[in-house]
């Protein structure tokens, strides 16, 4: 597992400690694991951890509904 993915899973585990299985394709928003407050918290944590700015146009379902979507977004914004 790459470093970005490990860090994202660690952040998600901090937000939702009750969830134990963070598969790459688990639907985070659709399944209710992340709600609007969780997404706001996640944005702050991702920004701080990866030293990135997440612009409003990146806050879309596709980027936040899976670990894989989050990894792709973080890698893209880190370039």
Descriptions of predicted regions:
Residues 1-21, 72-79:
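Thiotemplate assembly-line natural product biosynthesis machinery
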Residues 13-33, 51-60:
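Phosphopantetheine carrier-protein modules
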Residues 40:
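Conserved catalytic core of two-component sensor histidine kinases
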């Amino acid at each position: 597992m790459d470093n970005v993915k490990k860090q994202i899973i660690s952040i998600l585990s901090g937000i939702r400690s009750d969830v134990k299985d963070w598969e790459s394709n688990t639907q985070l928003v659709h399944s209710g694991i992340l709600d609007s407050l969780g997404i706001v918290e996640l944005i702050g944590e991702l920004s701080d951890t990866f030293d990135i700015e997440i612009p409003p146009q990146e806050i879309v379902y596709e980027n936040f509904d899976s670990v894989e979507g989050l990894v792709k977004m973080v890698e893209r914004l880190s370039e």
